[in-house]
Amino acid sequence: MIITQTSHCYMTSLGILFLINILPGTTGQGESRRQEPGDFVKQDIGGLSPKHAPDIPDDSTDNITIFTRILDRLLDGYDNRLRPGLGDAVTEVKTDIYVTSFGPVSDTDMEYTIDVFFRQTWHDERLKFDGPMKILPLNNLLASKIWTPDTFFHNGKKSVAHNMTTPNKLLRLVDNGTLLYTMRLTIHAECPMHLEDFPMDVHACPLKFGSYAYTTAEVVYSWTLGKNKSVEVAQDGSRLNQYDLLGHVVGTEIIRSSTGEYVVMTTHFHLKRKIGYFVIQTYLPCIMTVILSQVSFWLNRESVPARTVFGVTTVLTMTTLSISARNSLPKVAYATAMDWFIAVCYAFVFSALIEFATVNYFTKRSWAWEGKKVPEALEMKKKTPAAPAKKTSTTFNIVGTTYPINLAKDTEFSTISKGAAPSASSTPTIIASPKATYVQDSPTETKTYNSVSKVDKISRIIFPVLFAIFNLVYWATYVNRESAIKGMIRKQ
């Protein structure tokens, strides 16, 4: 009996201890129990743990679950190797482009760089769904699990899809099966250039894209918003230093090859070169060199060293300018507008040098009565031939009258400046003798040396006038051509 009571008390104690341990807030001594790692208690942010929180319906969790099931169902049995509507209809891919930056343009490589958001839209009946949302934003990873157009750029040398920090791709699925696929691309594309009008040239740089494998019987392309609004360039998107972006023209082409016909979407960006750099670098130096070469016409023709330096220096300068002007251009086989200008300037400079050589070699020296005095020996003209007198007398007799002769010691003649009055010694002196009579004539005028050539006088007028006419025709021609091209682009 005692053993039975003892066992009963022992079992009662164990039950009490068990109840105390399972109570959440107390210990055996009535103090609060410390938190164990596995318990869920009230968090610092004020939220309740799932264990103690009331049952609140989570719509986002339900939507995620719903769309997960929708995607799993859509991709179940989906074959991304087959295009939409295979065997029934042609797949239409609508495209549009937003240009974030345009440039730079390389003249030597004949290419340009463009950064775009490239958007494609198409319809896939296999991806229709019913759900709480009409448009389902998707991760770019899903793009590898569905069919996407095999679009490529016909004139692209290199295209880069941006992947920082993740692939810059956007994919949206509408409940009717329409997909929007957007990528950010940097494209290096060819730009054929015709440089006959350089540097007043205008270029149309194309951007062409289309399907690589699907012909027009399978896939066709069209512009999403029409030809006028499907290509947009950001207002601050120009990265051009030497060009102005005049506008763009959108179109569609059909190309034919041995494998069939393909649709090609085209956009031509019209560029006008800025001429300011070339005016400062080439045109003004050429004009100044030509003017400098014509200064030699105003120098005396006896100034051989000075005029030679003018001619040779200007010719060498034009040669240097013509070489440097070609460095920024591709090595084309035809002459550009700048080449023609430099060639004409070179001809003017070289002609000035040839003109001096002609004047110096062929033109005879002319004499005039003005300018610098050059002494000449006076000529003795024998009026009456007779035998010379044997004895010099200090007197001579004219009609029975005797006159003394005043003989000067210095027989040289001094230079007489213009306008000086003749002296008494300049009058004719008659030397008389019984047998001979001589008359010595002194010049009443003195001759001067004149270095001005008639060819120089003509060149001073002809060369500047011809050069001015050439510039007038040259600039008027290219300015009018530029205006006509701009008007044509606006009409398009």
Curated annotation (Swiss-Prot):
One of its GO terms (cellular component) is GABA-A receptor complex. Residues 1-28 form the signal peptide. Alpha subunit of the heteropentameric ligand-gated chloride channel gated by gamma-aminobutyric acid (GABA), a major inhibitory neurotransmitter in the brain. GABA-gated chloride channels, also named GABA(A) receptors (GABAAR), consist of five subunits arranged around a central pore and contain GABA active binding site(s) located at the alpha and beta subunit interface(s). When activated by GABA, GABAARs selectively allow the flow of chloride anions across the cell membrane down their electrochemical gradient. The modification Phosphoserine is found at S426, S433, S442. Residues 31-42 have a biased composition (Basic and acidic residues). Its main location: membrane. Disulfide bonds join C191-C205. Potentiated by etomidate, propofol, pregnanolone and flurazepam. The chain crosses the membrane at residues 275-295, 306-325, 337-357, 458-478. Residues 296-305, 358-457 are cytoplasmic. It comes from Homo sapiens (Human). GABAARs subunits share a common topological structure: a peptide sequence made up of a long extracellular N-terminal, four transmembrane domains, intracellular or cytoplasmic domain located between the third and the fourth transmembrane domains. The modification Phosphothreonine is found at T427. This is Gamma-aminobutyric acid receptor subunit alpha-3. It is a multi-pass membrane protein.
